[in-house]
C-alpha cells in the first residue's frame, strides 16, 4: 500500500510515522521545500514533533501532483482552512480507486462546509464513498509515543471505513468504524470551540462545576447542529463526540483550551496567536460555526459567547455572566 500524508505538522507527522512503522511505503508532504529537505536530512520533525525518529520507509517530499498520482491512499492533515487550497493542486489528477482520509477538523470560513464537503466541492472527480474522516481523542504527543489511543474511521462507505481501519489499526492505536460522517465531522469541529470556552473558565479561575457545565451544554449545542445538518445524535456518545470533547477540554496538550485559558487571563487573541507555533483550529471554527448556526437557525449560546470574546473583544467575565443569566429553560431544549 502506498500512502501520501499531506501536512508535516505534529498530527500529519505522527500518522506518517505510525503508518511507516507498520512497514507501509509512506511519503510525507511538506508545504515548503526547505522544510521538506530538513525533515529528510534530520529524520525527525524537530519543529513540531521533536524526538520522534522517522522509520526508513518514510520519505519527505515537496512536490504534490506526482505524489498524488503515486499514492493509493491520501491522508489530508493540513489545517482546515488550508484544505481547499491544498487539494486544488491535484484537481486534474484521476482519483479513481483511491481513498482520501481527512484528519483536519473544522468548518470552512465563508462557505460553512464540512471538510468532506470541501473535498467534494474542489475535487469533482472524487466520490463521497472514497472519503473517510479519521477523528477522535488523539493528541499527537501521545500517539507518537505509542500510548493507547482510540479513534473512529467514518465514511458512508463501510468498505472504505474498514480499509482505513485495517490501515491504521495497531495494538496501541485502536480504530472503530462509523458511517455517520456528518455527525463525526460536526462533533470534531465544534468541540474545539467548546474547548476554548473550557479554557476561558480555567483562566477566570472557575472550578470543576463550571467546566462540567461547559462540556455538557457544549455537547447539547453540538447535538442540535448535528441533527440539523443531517447527522445522528447517537454519534455524539462515541469517540468523535464525547470522547474528543472531553480530552480537548481537559488536556494540557490542547491548543484550543490553552487559547481560552489565556483569553480568560486577559490576553488578546492577537497576542496569543503570535506566541503559538501551531494553529488552534477552534479560533477559525468559532467564526465559521457561529455564522453557520445563524444561517441554519440553531441556538448555540456557548459558541456565540466564544465568538464574541474572540472577535468582538467582549470581556470574558461578562460573557460568562450573560450565559448564566439567560432565561431558564428545559435541559432538553
Curated annotation (Swiss-Prot):
Keywords on record: Cytoplasm, Lipid biosynthesis, Lipid metabolism, NAD, NADP, Nucleotide-binding, Oxidoreductase, Phospholipid biosynthesis, Phospholipid metabolism
Catalytic activity field: sn-glycerol 3-phosphate + NAD(+) = dihydroxyacetone phosphate + NADH + H(+); sn-glycerol 3-phosphate + NADP(+) = dihydroxyacetone phosphate + NADPH + H(+)
A molecular function GO annotation: NAD binding
Binding site for NADPH: 10-11, 31-32, 105, 140, 255, 279, 281
Subcellular location(s) per record: Cytoplasm
Pathway stated in the Swiss-Prot or TrEMBL entry: Membrane lipid metabolism; glycerophospholipid metabolism
Signal peptide extent: none
Binding site for sn-glycerol 3-phosphate: 105, 136, 138, 191, 244, 254-256
Enzyme class name: oxidoreductase
PROSITE patterns recorded: NAD_G3PDH
Recorded coiled-coil stretches: none
Protein's GO biological process: carbohydrate metabolic process; glycerol-3-phosphate biosynthetic process; glycerol-3-phosphate catabolic process; glycerophospholipid metabolic process; phospholipid biosynthetic process
Its EC number(s): 1.1.1.94
Cellular component annotations (GO), alphabetically ordered: cytosol
InterPro entries found in the cross-reference section: 6-PGluconate_DH-like_C_sf, 6PGD_dom2, G3P_DH_NAD-dep, G3P_DH_NAD-dep_C, G3P_DH_NAD-dep_N, NAD(P)-bd_dom_sf
Active site: 191
Gene3D superfamilies: N-(1-d-carboxylethyl)-l-norvaline Dehydrogenase, domain 2, NAD(P)-binding Rossmann-like Domain
Entry superkingdom: Bacteria
Family of the protein in this entry: Belongs to the NAD-dependent glycerol-3-phosphate dehydrogenase family.
PANTHER family, alphabetized: GLYCEROL-3-PHOSPHATE DEHYDROGENASE, GLYCEROL-3-PHOSPHATE DEHYDROGENASE [NAD(+)] 2, CHLOROPLASTIC
Stored NCBIfam families: PRK00094.1-2, PRK00094.1-3, PRK00094.1-4
Function field: Catalyzes the reduction of the glycolytic intermediate dihydroxyacetone phosphate (DHAP) to sn-glycerol 3-phosphate (G3P), the key precursor for phospholipid synthesis.
Protein name in UniProt: Glycerol-3-phosphate dehydrogenase [NAD(P)+]
Amino acid at each position: 500500500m502506498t500512502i501520501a500524508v499531506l501536512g508535516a505538522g505534529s498530527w500529519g507527522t505522527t500518522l506518517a510515522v505510525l503508518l511507516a512503522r507498520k512497514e507501509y511505503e509512506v511519503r510525507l508532504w511538506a508545504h515548503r521545500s526547505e522544510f521538506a529537505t530538513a525533515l529528510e536530512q534530520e529524520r525527525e520533525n524537530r519543529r513540531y514533533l521533536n524526538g520522534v525518529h522517522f522509520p526508513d520507509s518514510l520519505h519527505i517530499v515537496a512536490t504534490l501532483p506526482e505524489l498524488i498520482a503515486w499514492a493509493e491512499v491520501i491522508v489530508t492533515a493540513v489545517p482546515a482552512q488550508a484544505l481547499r487550497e491544498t487539494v486544488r493542486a491535484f484537481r486534474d489528477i484521476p482519483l479513481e480507486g483511491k481513498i482520501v482520509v481527512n484528519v483536519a477538523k473544522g468548518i470552512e470560513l465563508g462557505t460553512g462546509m464540512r471538510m468532506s464537503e470541501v473535498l467534494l466541492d474542489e475535487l469533482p472527480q472524487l466520490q463521497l464513498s472514497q472519503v473517510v474522516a479519521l477523528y477522535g481523542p488523539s493528541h499527537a504527543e501521545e500517539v507518537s509515543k505509542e500510548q493507547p489511543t482510540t479513534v473512529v474511521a467514518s465514511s458512508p462507505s463501510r468498505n472504505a471505513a474498514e480499509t482505513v481501519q485495517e490501515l491504521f489499526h495497531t495494538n496501541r492505536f485502536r480504530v472503530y468504524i462509523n458511517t455517520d460522517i456528518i455527525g463525526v465531522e460536526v462533533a470534531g469541529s465544534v468541540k474545539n470551540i467548546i474547548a476554548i470556552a473550557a479554557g476561558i473558565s480555567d483562566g477566570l479561575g472557575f472550578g470543576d462545576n463550571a467546566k462540567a457545565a461547559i462540556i455538557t451544554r457544549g455537547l447539547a449545542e453540538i447535538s442540535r447542529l448535528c441533527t440539523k445538518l443531517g447527522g445522528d445524535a447517537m454519534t455524539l456518545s462515541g469517540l468523535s463526540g464525547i470522547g474528543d470533547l472531553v480530552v480537548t477540554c481537559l488536556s494540557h496538550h490542547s491548543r484550543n483550551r490553552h487559547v481560552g485559558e489565556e483569553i480568560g487571563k486577559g490576553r488578546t487573541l492577537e497576542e496569543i496567536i503570535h506566541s503559538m507555533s501551531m494553529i488552534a483550529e477552534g479560533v477559525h471554527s468559532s467564526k465559521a460555526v457561529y455564522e453557520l448556526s445563524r444561517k441554519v437557525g440553531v441556538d448555540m449560546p456557548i459558541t456565540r459567547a466564544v465568538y464574541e470574546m474572540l472577535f468582538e473583544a467582549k470581556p470574558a467575565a461578562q460573557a460568562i455572566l450573560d450565559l448564566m443569566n439567560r432565561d431558564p429553560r428545559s435541559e432538553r431544549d
